[in-house]
Amino acid sequence: MLNWQMAERESTEHLISKVVNSVVFFEEFVFAKNKFKSAPGMELELADAVVALDDVLLVMQIKERSDRSANTPEIEQKWFQRKVVGVATRQIRDTLRYLVEHNEIKLANEYGRIFDLAAGRYSEIIRFVLYQASDNLPESCRLKKFHRSAEGGFIHILDVEDYLKIAQLLRDPEDSIRYFRYRELMLSKLESECAS
């Protein structure tokens, strides 16, 4: 069982990419070291966390509010739009592009074993942006459950607290995959009612 008090002291990125994903998805499937060589002397960076499960790849970008002091709701909304909806979804799109453009993307899992993560090996890529904001984040931002773009497709947007609850409940990797498939299906069907 994860010690949540200890986990709260960790950075969100470390907590998600190493602790929770290793517990939920097993360390052999988690790739938290995300830099790879694309050409001699050139290094590129994938999203913050990548989880490879058979022919499904989970790609996660994590945004944490560095200044969690009592900012105004307006400042928090600007942070959310700029960092979560803007920068994080762009980083997901960049990762998707790297996965397609490169024939080989060799990364070590948490055990140090090298895997090739190029996109041709996966029938499905599930995309997430996880965020941790201050308490002053407006409800309108919290209601944004996904982002859709021509290049990135459907990208789940979740508060880190929600992700942690899901991770606690869905201990089996296949259950997590099914949950996020269903979440995408339902949010797509109800798009006009969701904060999209």
PLM feature spans:
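Intrinsically disordered, low-complexity Ser/Thr/Pro/Gly-rich regulatory segments
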Residues: 1-196
